[in-house]
């Protein structure tokens, strides 16, 4: 038996079914090319018979993808298989994936046929698909709830008909790992021609067990896992590609198998799919969540600084990230504060660690997470505990519409002076940001803009979180208001004030250096 597990990605077929809005052909191609870079062996990219648009997207992807095998789905019907075959003809290498339900509830209630009819339809579909390609995959839909005797008969007949891959789906995410592994083990024990095909699994996450079921199946001999980026898919989603890929890599000592996945492309691919599908990744998502490599506990942070593998079983670099995050919160210890100051180039002799740590705890209790620029200001700018607002929003007005360019008028209090500015922009938020940037004179680029709703009804608030770049450094801002334009402005002003404090620190440091140089010169 091979020690390689084939990764069959179905983000563009099963994953896309979960989206509120369909992806464009261009967006699907972007994702397909990202999957190719990631190293997936097979990508299922659509259901050609379902619509002209799906046919076109499958054909376009098939024409452009060269390294991965392109697959399309078809019911066990000649018209479905013909549509898939025609759409895939232009591919370098392709697969037709045909399926039929095999569980009693599906056969009797959905198909309203006998199992013998279903068996015959499955065999006929495989033979029809082989007119287009030798690479035919057959799925026993709802295999997890199919009587085992019927499942064994179907698998044996499908292999005899010419299917190279037999897929065993837990379509409704019903089974538990021992149960699903037992199904796979039984197939290997009872199907006489099982060695003539690759056994695949396709698990859904309705009970949160899709990844565990897939790994259990591999331990029993399955050599293909069907999965999606970020686990997107019908209902609660599908088996997560990034999770199974990293499990098989990290626990190769136990599982003894490998994949062709380029793990350093995982984070990049996850982010692209999240963006194009408009499906944010939950922060605590394994492998690709924002908190996956973040440490907030002081004990954990201290351990990671001493040896990363104390609390990290995989490295952020292994999935394409540059480093882990030590979130500075009220739970962080002195060791973390000293480490962050050293990483910014400040020797311990240039500040009082005990004094800095006391100020840090006060600020952390007030605002939650503290950033590097906050730490600098705490060390070298005495008024930081008062959170001085050098820039303060006094007035905001916007005019926009579908046929007019957005215009904004903004008044800021800058120190003790009121400064006004007007500007146009690509939408009201951009117009407001143009005004603020003109008033402050800072050349800022926005890396991330995120809007969240807080509360319900007419009293609901819009929270805007942004990450901005200024002179190579990242600054975080947050605004909260009933008007999202105002909350957007407040978020940028939050950033502006942080930048101003950072500049004050830099100027103070320059004065300190100049003063020291003068004293040294006079001493000489």
Swiss-Prot record:
Gene3D superfamilies registered for this protein in UniProt: 1.10.238.260, 3.30.160.270, Aldolase class I (3.20.20.70)
Entry's localization field: Cytoplasm
Pathway membership, UniProt: Amino-acid biosynthesis; L-leucine biosynthesis; L-leucine from 3-methyl-2-oxobutanoate: step 1/4
Gene Ontology annotations of biological process type: L-leucine biosynthetic process
Enzyme Commission no: 2.3.3.13
InterPro entries registered for this protein in UniProt: 2-IPM_HCS-like, 2-isopropylmalate_synth_dimer, AIPM/Hcit_synth_CS, Aldolase_TIM, LeuA/HCS_post-cat, LeuA_allosteric_dom_sf, LeuA_bact_synth, PYR_CT
Domain of life: Bacteria
Keywords: Amino-acid biosynthesis, Branched-chain amino acid biosynthesis, Cytoplasm, Leucine biosynthesis, Manganese, Metal-binding, Transferase
Domain Pyruvate carboxyltransferase: 5-267
Signal sequence extent: none
Pfam families, A to Z: HCS_D2, HMGL-like, LeuA_dimer
Record-level GO cellular component terms: cytosol
Broad class of the protein's primary localization: cytoplasm
GO molecular function list: 2-isopropylmalate synthase activity; acetyl-CoA C-acetyltransferase activity; manganese ion binding
Cofactors, names only: Mn(2+)
Catalytic activity: 3-methyl-2-oxobutanoate + acetyl-CoA + H2O = (2S)-2-isopropylmalate + CoA + H(+)
Annotated stretches, region: Regulatory domain: 392-524
PANTHER family in the cross-refs: 2-ISOPROPYLMALATE SYNTHASE 1, CHLOROPLASTIC-RELATED (PTHR10277:SF9), HOMOCITRATE SYNTHASE-RELATED (PTHR10277)
Family: Belongs to the alpha-IPM synthase/homocitrate synthase family. LeuA type 1 subfamily.
Quaternary data: Homodimer.
Function recorded in the entry: Catalyzes the condensation of the acetyl group of acetyl-CoA with 3-methyl-2-oxobutanoate (2-ketoisovalerate) to form 3-carboxy-3-hydroxy-4-methylpentanoate (2-isopropylmalate).
Protein name per its UniProtKB record: 2-isopropylmalate synthase
Gene designation per UniProt: leuA
């Amino acid at each position: 038996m091979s020690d390689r597990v084939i990764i069959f990605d179905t983000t563009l077929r099963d994953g896309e079914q979960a989206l509120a809005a369909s992806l464009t052909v261009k967006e699907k191609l972007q994702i397909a090319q990202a999957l190719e870079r990631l190293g997936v062996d097979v990508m299922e990219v659509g259901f050609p018979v379902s619509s002209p648009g799906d046919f076109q997207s499958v054909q376009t992807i098939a024409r452009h993808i060269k390294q991965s095998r392109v697959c399309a789905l078809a019911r066990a019907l000649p018209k479905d298989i013909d549509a898939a075959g025609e759409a895939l003809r232009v591919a370098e290498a392709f697969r037709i994936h045909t399926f039929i339900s095999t569980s009693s509830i599906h056969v009797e209630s959905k198909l309203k046929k006998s199992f013998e009819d279903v068996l015959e339809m499955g065999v006929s579909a495989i033979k029809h698909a082989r007119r287009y390609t030798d690479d035919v995959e057959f799925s026993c839909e709802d295999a997890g709830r199919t009587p085992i005797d019927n499942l064994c008969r179907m698998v044996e007949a499908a292999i005899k008909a010419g299917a190279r891959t037999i897929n065993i789906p837990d379509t409704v995410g019903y089974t538990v790992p021992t149960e699903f592994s037992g199904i796979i083990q039984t197939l290997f024990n009872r199907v006489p021609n099982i060695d003539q095909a690759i056994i695949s699994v396709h698990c859904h996450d309705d009970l949160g067990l899709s990844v565990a079921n897939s790994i259990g199946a591999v331990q029993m001999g399955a050599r293909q896992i069907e999965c999606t980026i970020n686990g997107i898919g019908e209902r609660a989603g599908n088996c997560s590609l990034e999770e199974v890929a990293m499990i098989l890599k990290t626990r190769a000592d136990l599982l003894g198998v490998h994949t062709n996945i380029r793990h350093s492309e995982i984070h990049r691919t996850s982010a692209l799919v999240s963006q194009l599908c408009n499906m944010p990744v939950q922060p605590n998502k394994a492998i690709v969540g924002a908190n996956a490599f973040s440490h907030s506990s002081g004990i954990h942070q201290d351990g990671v600084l001493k040896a990363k593998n104390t609390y990290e079983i995989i490295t952020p670099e292994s999935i394409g990230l540059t480093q882990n995050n030590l979130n500075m919160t009220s739970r962080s210890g002195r060791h973390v504060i000293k480490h962050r100051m050293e990483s910014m180039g400040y020797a311990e002799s240039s500040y009082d660690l005990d004094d800095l740590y006391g100020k840090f705890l006060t600020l952390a209790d007030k605002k939650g997470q503290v950033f590097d620029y906050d730490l600098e200001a705490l060390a070298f700018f005495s008024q930081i505990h008062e959170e001085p607002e050098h820039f303060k929003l006094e007035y905001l007005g916007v005019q926009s519409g579908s046929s007019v360019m957005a215009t904004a008028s903004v008044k800021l209090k800058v120190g003790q002076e009121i400064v006004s500015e007007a500007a146009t922009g690509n939408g009201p938020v951009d117009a407001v940001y143009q005004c603020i940037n003109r008033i402050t004179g800072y050349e800022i680029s926005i890396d991330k803009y995120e809007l969240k709703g807080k509360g319900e009804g007419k009293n609901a608030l819009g929270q805007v979180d942004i990450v901005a770049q200024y002179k190579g450094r990242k600054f975080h801002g947050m605004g909260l208001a009933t008007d999202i334009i105002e909350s957007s402005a407040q978020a940028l002003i939050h950033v502006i004030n942080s930048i101003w404090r950072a500049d004050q620190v830099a100027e103070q440091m320059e004065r300190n250096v100049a003063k020291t140089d003068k004293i040294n010169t006079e001493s000489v």
